[in-house]
Amino acid sequence: MEKREELYRGKAKSVYKTDDADRLILLFRNDTSAFDGKRIEQLDRKGMVNNKFNAFIMQKLEAAGVPTQFDKLLGDNECLVKKLDMIPVECVVRNYAAGSLVKRLGVEEGMKLNPYTFELFLKDDAKGDPFINESHVVAFGWGTAEQLARMKELSLKVNEVLSKLFDDAGLLLVDFKLEFGVFSDGSIVLGDEFSPDGCRLWDKDTKKKMDKDRFRQGLGDVIEAYEEVAQRLGVPL
């Protein structure tokens, strides 16, 4: 597989074309950002940890029947993925109150949500990733009602699979965000990544935060926490 020019550079990953029109290479960098990219730092080993963590999770999801863009690892910081036409909407599933939900509704952090909540946000850093609903997505042409229904179905399947996976490792899956795209055959496929950058994970007993909130809130030991989560899950680093 030949790596060609950079197609897109995000806050923590770069996307490269390949000699296959249906495949891309994702490069996980050590860049760590918060507050819509207003704060960026380099954290050693982060790209490697997130790349291998993502590969592990995506393979678990594929085995459970969730279609993902992941194909295979290419090295410590790179993986091969299917090329998707990304839908500019983030799907957020929350099992416990945290983050923007606490700020928005004034509820207590850590409150168990019964049942979970499913939310949509427009993927637009310049606008602060605003909270939206299904009718906005359809009205503005970001996606169809059928695509949204499939995205929600897959998001809830991911929650079912990963809540148990993390629970077995002594962790609470507090919340997470997912992004989806359309593959060349028209199917909806889970894209982007799943890592501690895009979810909240707390130790079940101590409620210690084991995710990017350690960076956002200045708690320190960010990569050490990521590596501990990986070790508990059995991710080969």
From Swiss-Prot:
Pathway the protein acts in: Purine metabolism; IMP biosynthesis via de novo pathway; 5-amino-1-(5-phospho-D-ribosyl)imidazole-4-carboxamide from 5-amino-1-(5-phospho-D-ribosyl)imidazole-4-carboxylate: step 1/2
EC number(s) stated in the UniProt entry for this protein: 6.3.2.6
Gene Ontology cellular component terms for the protein in this record: cytosol
Keyword presence, Lyase: no
Keywords: ATP-binding, Ligase, Nucleotide-binding, Purine biosynthesis
Any coiled-coil regions, as ranges: none
Lineage: Bacteria, Pseudomonadati, Pseudomonadota, Gammaproteobacteria, Pseudomonadales
Domain of life: Bacteria
Listed GO MF terms: ATP binding; phosphoribosylaminoimidazolesuccinocarboxamide synthase activity
Species this chain originates from: Pseudomonas fluorescens (strain ATCC BAA-477 / NRRL B-23932 / Pf-5)
HAMAP family for this protein: SAICAR_synth
GO biological process, one term: cobalamin biosynthetic process
Catalytic reaction equation(s): 5-amino-1-(5-phospho-D-ribosyl)imidazole-4-carboxylate + L-aspartate + ATP = (2S)-2-[5-amino-1-(5-phospho-beta-D-ribosyl)imidazole-4-carboxamido]succinate + ADP + phosphate + 2 H(+)
Family to which this protein belongs: Belongs to the SAICAR synthetase family.
Gene3D superfamilies reported in the protein's UniProt record: ATP-grasp fold, B domain (3.30.470.20), Phosphorylase Kinase, domain 1 (3.30.200.20)
Stated name of the protein: Phosphoribosylaminoimidazole-succinocarboxamide synthase
